Regions:
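Extracytoplasmic and endomembrane cell-envelope/extracellular-matrix remodeling and assembly machinery
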Residues: 103-137, 142-144, 154-155, 194-226, ...
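Cell-wall polysaccharide-cleaving catalytic domain and substrate-binding groove, primarily
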Residues: 168-184, 213-220, 239-242
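Active-site-adjacent bridging/hinge elements
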Residues: 159-161, 188-194, 249
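Short, surface-exposed glycine/acidic/tryptophan-bearing loops
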Residues: 119, 175-196
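Alpha-helical scaffolds flanking conserved acidic
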Residues: 158-165, 182, 230-235
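Solvent-exposed coil/turn segments that connect beta secondary-structure elements
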Residues: 169-170, 190-192, 283
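An acidic, Gly/Ser/Thr/Pro-rich helix-cap/linker signature
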Residues: 1-153
């Protein structure tokens, strides 16, 4: 089976192991019925998994109901952390939630302290599983993947980059985001036009997988030239070249350092995790039969 060590010279995974493991689980173990409550910075800390039998759907009222339940659960976790911070670790007085939090923290080899609980209570984040979505992405990618890999090859770029749409769009050819990005590569209009894709009333080449792949290859080539390594170039696909160049000026070219130190209103969970999601997506898509058999 494929392991990330096979591509490590271009796409280093050292130091990212825990993050990759988290996303591997989100892609393969947890489906749309599952929502993980976890720490947004330390992805080893998964406090709870809430199951919704209706999954993501149907209708807005179901979505609202789920968010209400998750909001309450987040408050319960935060309150449990406050209690641990104030009352200490007397196991006789602990409820199930407090015991669970303590177990999770200790299994990550962290030292429980009032300061730690104070920090963690503000970091509780939700992440829904996307197993079904990822499986569909594997099936859809089969149509064009060989040609997409050839495109990257032609540009002298690593073929693994052709797997980035697993993270961007699950290879949904008609994908449109609320922000106005479209196609498997989720190009915004302005970027698409800058890379010579035609976007007007009669044609939108962002929805043409092969034309968009060629534009994405040129974008990533530019990013790599400007930023100097693949972790930064790939992160810039989510965060923008300018933002990552600024982060590099401040903190150097190691993505791990940037993730822990760079402060910016727009450099949040999605940007911090984009590169590791790519690593997990490469690993899962190359090993998908191990997880699910033939699709």
């Amino acid at each position: 089976s494929f392991s990330l060590n096979q591509i490590s010279d271009r796409f280093p995974s050292e130091g990212f192991e825990a993050r990759v493991a988290f996303w591997r689980a989100v892609f393969t173990q947890y489906g749309k019925q599952d929502v993980l409550l976890h720490d947004k910075n330390d992805l080893r800390l998964i406090y709870d998994v809430v199951r919704f039998t209706r999954g993501t759907g149907p209708g807005k009222s179901e979505t609202r109901r789920q968010w209400r339940i998750l909001r309450i659960r987040k408050k319960q976790l935060a309150a449990a952390m406050d209690s641990l911070r104030i009352r200490g670790l007397d196991s006789k007085k602990m409820d199930k939630t407090q015991q669970r939090i303590l177990t999770v923290i200790q299994s990550a080899e962290l030292e429980p302290s009032p300061l730690l609980f104070k920090k963690l209570r503000n970091n509780i984040h939700t992440q829904r599983g996307i197993k079904e979505k990822f499986q569909k992405g594997i099936i859809r990618s089969g149509i064009y993947l060989r040609e997409m890999e050839n495109t990257f090859d032609r540009h002298g770029l690593p073929k693994e980059l052709a797997l980035l749409p697993h993270v961007e769009s699950s290879f949904n050819f008609a994908s449109r985001s609320r922000r106005g990005a479209a196609g498997i590569w989720q190009f915004m209009r302005r970027t698409a036009r800058a890379y010579n894709l035609r976007v007007n009333r009669s044609i939108d080449q962002r929805l043409d997988p092969l034309a968009a792949t060629d534009a994405a290859a040129r974008y990533l080539k530019d990013s790599y030239r400007k930023l100097g390594n693949w972790p930064l170039a790939i992160t810039s696909y989510n965060h923008g070249q300018t933002g990552i160049a600024r982060a590099k000026r401040r903190h150097g070219s190691n993505l791990l350092t940037i993730i822990s130190k760079y402060q910016s209103r727009s450099f949040k969970y999605a940007s911090k995790n984009f590169y590791v999601e790519f690593l997990a997506a490469v690993e899962v898509s190359k090993n998908y039969r191990t997880y699910w058999g033939p699709l």
